[in-house]
Amino acid sequence: MASFGTALTIRHLEGDGMAQAATPVAEAAVGASGTDAQVVKGADGHYWAEANIDGKAVRVLVDTGASVVALTRADALRLGVEPEPEAFTGKVQTASGVVRAAPVQLKTISVAGARVDRVEALVVEQGLEYSLLGMSYLGRLSAFSATPAGLTLRP
């Protein structure tokens, strides 16, 4: 699977080893609705999208190497998602090293019309430059594909 993002991929860590995150792909893309969405490739070669997360706009990097949607602490606060300090029980590997994260569930994420409800996500405590649109969203779509010009998301 190609990664559309940078080396800032999020992977769950268990014990001393890295666990492969299993992303459930529903038979009929359960929870996905709407219309096909187009994401234009940025001048930097990455796929940046304006996501509507729980009713608010958040700029995200599309990253198939991220097992889940990952929110920066600042984006989470703007969305009204404020995990308690003791909720940061997870550990994730980023390009910056191992950091703590808090699991959350987002009501809805929509990118240019491709909507997914009840999306699992992580709020990364620190060290994440920008929020990532990972496989907990992408894996619930019926399909997504990349071309040199852009990315198509199909609910």
Predicted regions and their residues:
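Pepsin/retropepsin-fold aspartyl endopeptidases
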Residues: 1-59, 64-155
